[in-house]
Every structure is written in C-alpha cells, then in structure tokens.
C-alpha cells in the first residue's frame, strides 16, 4: 500500500486549487516583468556547502549523495542559491532578480507544516539605498492587494536591534544568546529570571516591557523614546521611523505594525526586516529584509542587498477560499458538431466539452461535476 502514499509533508494539487495557484503565479510573474526584474531559476539540487554558514531554523534538510560523493541537498531557501549564482558567474551588479520555485524543508513532526513550499521572490542586489527596501515593500503591498481580498498587515522590524541591546548589557555571548532565545521564544518566566540581574540598570524597565514591544508604530516609537537605549540602536530606530513615514505617505491604506521583540525571518538579515500576514490565514504571506553580508560567504567582497519571499501556497489557500463559485456548463455534442461546440466553448469562460459517447453518459458527467448540461444535439442523437 505504500506505493499509494505520499511522502510526509507533501501533497498533490488538482482542479480548482491547481488552477488558482497557476493563476497567482502568472500574475506574480507578470508583475515582476512589468517592474523589470530579471527572471532567474536555480537547480532544485545544490551542494550542501551552499547552506553551511547558516542554521536553517526549526527544520532540517533533505540530503542525498551525488555520484562524486558530495552531499547534495534539495534547496531549503532561494536567496542563498541566488547569492551562489552571482558569485559564480560574476554577473554585473546591481541587478534585480525575480523567481518562482519550490523549496524543501523537513519540518518537525506533527507541526502541520508542509515540507514542499512554492515560493516567489525578489532579490535586489547591489543597492545600498533605502530605495531597495521601498521597492520590495511596494511590490508586497501591490501584490497582496491584487492576489487576495483580505487586508494584509505589514510588520516591520530590525535584525540588529535586539542583539545590540543585549550587547550593551553584557559582553558574555552565552548570556546574550540565552536572553535573546527566551525573548524570541516568548519564554517569559525564563526571560524574567535572566534579566533580574540587571535590575539596577537604567534599562531594566525597558527590559521588563520588551517581550510586549510590538504594535502600532506611534505607540512603539513613544515607548522607545522614553527608554535609555544604547546609541548603537539609534540608526536602526531612525531607519524604522523613516520607512514608516514613507509608507504612511505613499500607501496610506496599508496597515503597519512594528515588532522589535521577535527574531528576524532569516539569520542572514542585517537591517530592516518586514513580514506580511492576513487575519484569515495562519503564517506569514511574505517576509524579507536587508542582507548586506550574504555574498561574503561566496566571495571576498560584500554586496548590499534586499530580498523578499512570498508563500505562494498560503496565498493560494486564501485566494481559493475567497473565490466565487461559478456554475460550470458541460457541452454535449455529436462529432459532426465539433465546430459548433468549439464556437460555444469560446464564448463561455466556465464551459467544458463533454467527451461522453452518449447523452446518458453526459448527464451522469454533468451530475458529477454539478454542471449545467448544454445539449447541442437537441435530443436528436446518433446513439
């Protein structure tokens, strides 16, 4: 019976969901083309060394051995292969890339997550200006409103803020990591115990409130202004304020929040981070950020970059649930009426041809599809 079973964390896609997903991918690719992004496709298989510098979070890699004895992996991420491509080909920079492809991650058992995910994304490489973040945020705003009916909230953060705050408390890297882990995992009792030794420090009141440091920008910035934060975080806060002000001016309908108590979406981010989610769906619809040091793992010279990935599968689930169900029509005809049937089909967006041998078979097919039967024979069949 195993030959009928799918591997854990995978699924077949068929019918309405498959059509919806194909449509969303076409819309995304058209949007990328309209913005001048160069399409890029990297192999499903990569050398494991491509992903060695980074811990890939709460999941493992699919590994296999190549003929040359090297360990290969099914790519768990799209950004690192793009970085590998840039370094290997010496493609001139700056460049804007757009992609759609599948990634593979072995999730924890019983997590409810799929191990195969279709992701679309943008990589803007060689751009140090904040304009790169602005373009990614614009793409996210425009695509989310075009692809699904639900309002999407964009959550902003900073990859270096938390690390710089704890570094101002202690030089002990183990202690720093323990505090950050408890903070990011929302282990409040453990976090409270870890910060207790800093009770005499001016920053202690901020530390106590830190696990709840998320919400509307105005409230968060007011709270931050009252805290004696180290100078090392001021550039991050200024950048956040600049981005929020820009978003409020250019996309006033967009709901924005700030979260400085959560871990960055990827460990290689170095600056502004952003995520988008809908109240109707579990998980983030998209996430991204700046990663100015990623290419140093493949070459000596660093390159500034901003990237973003969209979860096409989650977008498909939301879009499928929101679609209006249209009554399909099933066209029955005799072989000599083929041209007439094709002409009718061309005018009806929700019609399909019945290939049944006789009218009785067409009626059974229409009932199964819950479709209206259009009989071009007028009941005068050759059966």
From Swiss-Prot:
Gene3D superfamilies: Bira Bifunctional Protein, Domain 2 (3.30.930.10)
A single GO molecular function term of this UniProt record: transferase activity
Annotated keywords: Amino-acid biosynthesis, Cytoplasm, Histidine biosynthesis
Pathway assigned to this chain's UniProt record: Amino-acid biosynthesis; L-histidine biosynthesis; L-histidine from 5-phospho-alpha-D-ribose 1-diphosphate: step 1/9
Entries under InterPro entries matching the protein: aa-tRNA-synth_II/BPL/LPL, HisRS-like_core, HisRS/HisZ, HisZ
GO BP term (any one): L-histidine biosynthetic process
Subcellular location: Cytoplasm
Chief localisation class: cytoplasm
Bridged cysteine pairs (disulfide): none
Function comment: Required for the first step of histidine biosynthesis. May allow the feedback regulation of ATP phosphoribosyltransferase activity by histidine.
Quaternary structure annotation from Swiss-Prot or TrEMBL: Heteromultimer composed of HisG and HisZ subunits.
Further remarks about this protein from its record: This function is generally fulfilled by the C-terminal part of HisG, which is missing in some bacteria such as this one.
HAMAP family referenced in this protein's UniProt entry, alphabetically: HisZ
Protein name: ATP phosphoribosyltransferase regulatory subunit
Protein source organism: Lactiplantibacillus plantarum (strain ATCC BAA-793 / NCIMB 8826 / WCFS1)
Gene: hisZ
